[in-house]
């Protein structure tokens, strides 16, 4: 209690000063206010003096600031504590009055409430502030104020009519032809934001129709409210540049591309080549990037109408190639013909073609007296322009191990070892070797506009890799993969990843088969298998909303995966034609001399995240993660590597990786004298929810409070794992954990220490009366399950 006895701000303030305790907005209106919540959020931005925040929910931040602001408080830790605190939010009537005037002006000038009135009232109260403890009693009486802003908006004016005027008749004719897409129409409420959007729309349409020099500055908005009604006639007046009476339209002229531009270049040193009416100048003997690729990345041509969107697409595409450090597009009117715009495209390549990147990662977790420490070393070698077409080739290798430590039992020992090598080739163009994209477009599965954008901006990815995982004295897995697909990000920022072709060969070796002697379904999931996709392997759609004005943002990740469906259909067709009843597989006698079955399953996973920023130092993050995998054909179980698990530093943090579940089943191995740090509890269905409150503590130290809940279930009843299958009682099998975290925030990454406590068990214990842990049982968990990792869990 030593820190708390004097945490009183009042004794540092003058007698005439008082703290702001709260602010709110109260609407007074006889009629319904359109979009009231949005209007309130807009008005709240004008309130400058808000109540001070608290550190760790009970220590006033203004007290920390004032306590370390004396003349003698000049040491480094005083500066740090002042930065941690906040200047006191002192009530000032002149500030509140200014806020009232700003709100009133905003309602009248921006939102169409021309008769709006704003006032305020102050509610004073004598509050007892300070702290009382067994050691001391330091409580003061101090005046605090609650400020209520009373907003009487009155009736909102509407748009009676919309008209466009200009002396440039050709321009005016074009503008009127596009008015169906206008942001301001008859019957709309008066809104300055919508007016600005309409000006922007008009300017953009004109810039995409040859009017390269047009801008919003040429558009004036006039309104006629001479009548007594609440409707206004709106006129968009389009001025012409003096002394002209019209705006100049441009067509594209000469296009010069400098493929290896440096400032010291002179035209005498350059070699000229031409392709598709584009001049390519180079200083090097050979082209760094194929001119055909550069030509296809330039979306405007000589003699065509000048369009702003084509220049932006060109800039984006050339930058996305990854070969050039700087991309500059300069334009200038032709010296002879004033309606022609010439272009110089300056491309400055990176000096290094090969780059190397390395990383060292680690994590730490606990389970009772057991400790698990994981470390991995990774290195990546990348070529920015492998074949002269800006192809990005990367070779990534990773080596990792997990060390277990159980004091007094086994000491330190290696629990897992893993190694992986992955080759990737990214081609910055759409290479539809199989013709699937064109087929989907021609059959109407995708729209014309989307297909055209996909063809222009999609990248082609080819991958080939190997990984090996060895759970020592348990099982090992060797996996080989090969994929071919496309990666496309739309103008709105939505990402599409489509892999029509993909193969995964998974080879298992079980060291301890006795562990699965009573669990045949688990044993089947460890069968050697080949995952296949000849036309469709998997598809991912990632939606990112961006942050709204209220601090909300959403991230949604959808993944749909299918394996073996082409093999299954072909096998069934063969059986129908031949009258056979065979199930195709790769039998012994192959190069590996192993029986390999075709993996047949359908898998879907949803990961939805919501982030809410309350301020620069406080936010709330939440996640809902759902998944299901269904085997089909003769497969009784889906591959172990594609099943779902919960627990670990990025899931249920009170449990270790794959410790909880499935369902209400409890792994008998956890009852052994030596606690198991490596678990294999997985399922076909996953439900998980997480919520985390994040806040700043001091300098680079952040804090978090979190709750995690979820479990996995099997699709089918398993005699060897009672209560593992999904049922109507699944809610009673939800595991719940809670805890707190400390994060060292280094901007680009953070090191995370999470302390998770089991709050609710997913299974019923015959000894304990409830699945909920008592407060005493939670305290007995000590520091809880300690998880140390890098970056946020979601």
Q: Regions from the language model: what does each represent?
A:
Residues 687-695, 703, 709, 734-746, ...:
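Conserved C-terminal beta-signal and adjacent last beta-strands/turns
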Residues 279, 361-370, 497-695, 705-728:
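C-terminal outer-membrane beta-barrel translocator/porin domains of Gram-negative envelope proteins
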Residues 8-364, 375, 397-398, 403, ...:
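Periplasmic polypeptide-binding modules associated with outer-membrane biogenesis and secretion
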Residues 356-360, 393-397, 462-464, 556-560, ...:
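Membrane-embedded beta-strand positions of outer-membrane beta-barrel proteins
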Residues 349-351, 562, 615, 744-748:
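A generic beta-sheet turn/junction motif
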Residues 4-6:
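C-terminal motif of bacterial Sec signal peptides marking the signal peptidase cleavage site
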Residues 171-174, 287-288, 307-556, 653-654, ...:
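Gram-negative/organellar outer-membrane beta-barrel architecture
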Residues 722-772, 781:
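C-terminal structured "cap/appendage" subdomains that terminate the fold
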């Amino acid at each position: 209690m030593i820190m708390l006895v004097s945490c009183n701000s009042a004794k540092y303030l003058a007698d005439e000063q008082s703290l702001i305790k709260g602010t709110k907005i109260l609407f007074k209106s006889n009629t319904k206010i359109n979009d009231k919540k949005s209007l309130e959020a807009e008005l709240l931005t004008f309130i400058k003096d808000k109540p001070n925040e608290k550190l760790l929910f009970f220590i006033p931040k203004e007290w920390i600031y004032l306590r370390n602001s004396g003349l003698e408080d000049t040491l480094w830790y005083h500066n740090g504590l002042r930065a941690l605190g906040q200047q006191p939010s002192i009530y000032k009537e002149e500030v509140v009055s200014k806020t009232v005037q700003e709100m009133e002006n905003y309602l009248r000038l921006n939102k169409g409430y021309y008769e709006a009135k704003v006032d305020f009232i102050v509610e004073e109260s004598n509050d007892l502030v300070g702290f009382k403890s067994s050691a001391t009693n330091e409580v003061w009486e101090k005046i605090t104020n609650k400020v209520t802003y009373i907003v009487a908006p009155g009736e909102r004016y509407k748009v009676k009519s919309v008209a466009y005027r200009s002396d440039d008749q050709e321009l005016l004719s074009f503008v009127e032809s596009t008015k169906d897409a206008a942001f301001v129409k008859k019957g709309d409420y008066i809104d300055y934001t919508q007016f600005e959007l309409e000006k922007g729309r008009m300017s953009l349409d004109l810039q995409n129709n040859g009017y390269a020099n047009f801008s919003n500055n040429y558009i004036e908005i006039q309104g006629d409210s001479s009548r007594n009604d609440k409707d206004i006639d709106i006129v968009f007046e389009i001025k012409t540049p003096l002394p002209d009476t019209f705006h100049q339209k441009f067509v594209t002229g000469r296009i010069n591309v400098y493929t290896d531009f440096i400032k010291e270049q002179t035209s005498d040193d350059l070699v000229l080549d031409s392709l598709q009416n584009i001049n390519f100048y180079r200083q090097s003997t050979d082209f760094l990037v194929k001119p055909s690729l550069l030509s296809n990345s330039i979306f405007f041509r000589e003699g065509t109408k000048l369009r702003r969107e084509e220049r932006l697409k060109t800039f984006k595409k050339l930058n996305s190639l990854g070969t050039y450090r700087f991309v500059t597009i300069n334009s200038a009117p032709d010296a002879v013909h004033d309606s022609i715009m010439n272009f110089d495209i300056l491309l400055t390549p990176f000096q290094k073609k090969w780059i190397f990147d390395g990383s060292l990662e680690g994590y730490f977790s606990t389970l009772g007296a057991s400790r698990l420490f994981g470390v991995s070393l990774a290195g990546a070698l990348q070529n920015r322009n492998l074949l002269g077409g800006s192809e990005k080739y990367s070779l990534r290798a990773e080596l990792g191990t997990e060390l277990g430590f159980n004091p007094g039992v086994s000491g330190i020992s290696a629990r897992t070892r893993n190694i992986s090598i992955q080759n990737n080739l990214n081609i910055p163009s759409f290479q539809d070797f199989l013709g699937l994209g064109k087929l989907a477009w021609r059959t109407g599965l995708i729209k014309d506009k989307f297909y055209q954008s996909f063809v222009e901006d999609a990248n082609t990815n080819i991958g080939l890799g190997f990984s090996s995982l060895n759970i020592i004295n348990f099982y090992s897995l060797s996996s080989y993969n090969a994929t071919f697909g496309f990666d496309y990000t739309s103008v709105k920022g939505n990402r599409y990843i489509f892999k029509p072709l993909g193969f995964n060969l998974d080879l298992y070796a079980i060291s301890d088969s006795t562990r699965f002697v009573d669990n045949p379904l688990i044993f089947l999931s460890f069968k050697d298998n080949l995952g296949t996709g000849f036309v469709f392997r998997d598809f991912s759609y990632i939606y990112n909303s961006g942050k709204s004005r209220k601090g909300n943002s959403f991230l949604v990740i959808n993944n749909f995966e299918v394996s073996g469906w082409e093999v299954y259909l072909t096998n069934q067709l063969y059986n129908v034609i031949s009258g056979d009843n065979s199930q195709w597989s790769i039998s012994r006698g192959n190069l590996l001399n192993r029986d390999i079955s075709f993996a047949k399953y359908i898998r879907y996973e949803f990961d939805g995240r919501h982030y809410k920023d309350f301020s620069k130092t406080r936010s709330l993050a939440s996640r809902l993660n759902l998944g299901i995998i269904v085997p089909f054909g003769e497969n009784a179980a889906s591959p172990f590597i594609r099943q779902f698990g919960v627990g670990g530093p990025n899931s249920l943090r009170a449990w270790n990786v794959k410790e909880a579940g499935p369902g209400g089943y409890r792994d008998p191995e956890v009852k052994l004298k030596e606690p198991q740090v490596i678990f294999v509890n997985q399922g076909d269905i996953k439900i998980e929810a997480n919520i985390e409150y994040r806040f700043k503590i001091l300098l680079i130290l952040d804090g978090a409070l979190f709750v995690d809940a979820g479990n996995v279930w099997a699709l089918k009843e398993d005699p060897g794992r009672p209560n593992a299958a999904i049922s109507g009682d699944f809610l009673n099998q939800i595991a719940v954990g809670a805890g707190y975290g400390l994060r060292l925030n280094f901007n680009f990454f953070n090191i995370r220490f999470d302390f998770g406590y089991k709050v609710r068990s997913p299974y019923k214990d015959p000894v304990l009366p409830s699945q909920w842990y008592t407060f005493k049982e939670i305290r007995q968990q000590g520091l809880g399950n300690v998880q140390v990792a890098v970056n946020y869990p979601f």
